Amino acid sequence: MKLAYWMYAGPAHIGTLRIASSFKNVHAIMHAPLGDDYFNVMRSMLERERDYTPVTTSVVDRHVLARGSQEKVVDNITRKDAEEHPDLIVLTPTCTSSILQEDLQNFVERAQLEAKGDVMLADVNHYRVNELQAADRTLQQIVQFYIAKARKQGNLVTEKTEKPSVNIFGMTTLGFHNNHDATELKKLMSDLGIEVNAIVPAGASVHELKSLPRAWFNLVPYRETGLLAAEFLQQEFNMPYVDITPIGIVETARCIRKIQQVINAQGANVDYEPFIDQQTRFVSQAAWFSRSIDCQNLTGKKAVVFGDNTHAAALTKILAREMGIHVLLAGTYCKYDEAWFREQVSEYCDDVLVSDDNGQIADAIARLEPAAIFGTQMERHVGKRLDIPCGVIAAPIHIQNFPVGYKPFVGYEGSNQIVDLIYNSFTLGMEDHLLEIFGGHDTKEVITKSVSADSDLNWSKDGLAELNRIPGFVRGKVKRNTEKFARDRNITQITAEVLYAAKEAVGA
């Protein structure tokens, strides 16, 4: 166990609750002490939805510790069943309440005798997996549960649809731009003449799950959530799945070609090449932009990428392949899936970092001094501290990355959005000069206020004057190098002479 003030992936119960609260008319009961119940607040604050978060905490308090939990948990399940009439109630412990080692499956079976809806225990090892793994496992478990139930009742629908159709897996609450991605994928499938059979779990009813085998194939746009459910359906019904993330022009085309191959293997005869060509050359602005003079200004610029596997790998490829940007470091916090990430990005970047320690990532960014960072909310904080611009490309994210406007990341419109994000994240060279020339008499003073607040170093008047003569777009780097030079030599007052000496040392 370690104390952290920042976690990239939360504990397992958060993943289970994200899946349960993504479905329509599914309620979750969390068996937990009061400190673990922050999910409701987090989701209510971040997700722009009108409905209350369908999660109830069955609080583990001193009475429960004295008498055992069964009575309270069963009572909470049956009460919520009577009040809300959900189709399914999911019971989940947290890592804290798991210490009690109670037989929760027994509680579920006991509650099921009285409840009208279905009751299920989320079968997740809270000490071994994180939020993303638990979400993937819980989604698979719910799909399995309803396929088995339909089979038992004899109403499982296995007959394929007449036209090619798809199930889209992995869109969840609190996901990165998931709502917009779902809309864009529906549009893309419609353009390809493919019917959307179901989008699971976001907004889906559990009653739809018995019809999942009707689709011709499953699409899993995010590596973190949905893969286990797609693998289960492949084993049970021989349903193929496509797990190529359609982020960026190149990967979107690769995903569409894979879809073409999958549905042609089932008797269709489609050719999506004209569609890919039309979208790439004329409809999407991304390919045109990457050949423009604006993009050539970015060639060779240095960047650091960090996020979940899906988005970090996709952005690394876009930066390196489509925009000619030099990726110094590509990183992920999904340590459990390290091999896949390394295989995806190693040829597109100088170095790969797999870690969930935000301090390690911050140190790497400070050491490398990239022109821009593409990361999570945490990297945004790091960028602000180091005065390096940052584009947010992956969860965990704060409220500004749950946009009201339409901002997908997948498909051809997603490619346009990503191009804007990348281009606007780099500081343009002339910007600082123009600010200095036209910004009024106090501009230089404002710009040099970035001298470290917690610094043990003092800049003399002549040192600051010399620093202000340096062009704005490299001033931050020169300042940091000079301060490092001074610290290494135990110099506390930085004069113009120290600045010259530091420049010579770096030059040498």
Curated annotation (Swiss-Prot):
Substrate binds at residues 429-430. Keywords: 4Fe-4S, ATP-binding, Chlorophyll biosynthesis, Iron, Iron-sulfur, Metal-binding, Nucleotide-binding, Oxidoreductase, Photosynthesis. Component of the dark-operative protochlorophyllide reductase (DPOR) that uses Mg-ATP and reduced ferredoxin to reduce ring D of protochlorophyllide (Pchlide) to form chlorophyllide a (Chlide). This reaction is light-independent. The NB-protein (ChlN-ChlB) is the catalytic component of the complex. Its cofactor is [4Fe-4S] cluster. The lineage of its organism: Bacteria, Bacillati, Cyanobacteriota, Cyanophyceae, Leptolyngbyales. Its EC number is 1.3.7.7. The active site is at residue 294. Binds 1 [4Fe-4S] cluster per heterodimer. The cluster is bound at the heterodimer interface by residues from both subunits. The gene is chlB. [4Fe-4S] cluster binds at residue 36. GO terms for molecular function: 4 iron, 4 sulfur cluster binding; ATP binding; metal ion binding; oxidoreductase activity, acting on iron-sulfur proteins as donors; oxidoreductase activity, acting on the CH-CH group of donors, iron-sulfur protein as acceptor. Disruption phenotype: Cells lacking this gere are unable to synthesize chlorophyll, accumulating protochlorophyllide in darkness while synthesizing chlorophyll normally in the light. Pathway: Porphyrin-containing compound metabolism; chlorophyll biosynthesis (light-independent). InterPro entries: ChlB/BchB/BchZ (IPR050152), LI-POR_suB-like_C (IPR013580), Nase/OxRdtase_comp1 (IPR000510), P-CP_red_C (IPR042298), Protochl_reductB (IPR005969), Protochlorophyllide_Rdtase (IPR016209). It comes from the Bacteria. It is an enzyme of class 1 (oxidoreductase). This is Light-independent protochlorophyllide reductase subunit B. It catalyses: chlorophyllide a + oxidized 2[4Fe-4S]-[ferredoxin] + 2 ADP + 2 phosphate = protochlorophyllide a + reduced 2[4Fe-4S]-[ferredoxin] + 2 ATP + 2 H2O. CDD domains: Pchlide_reductase_B. NCBIfam families: DPOR_BchB. Protochlorophyllide reductase is composed of three subunits; ChlL, ChlN and ChlB. Forms a heterotetramer of two ChlB and two ChlN subunits. Belongs to the ChlB/BchB/BchZ family.
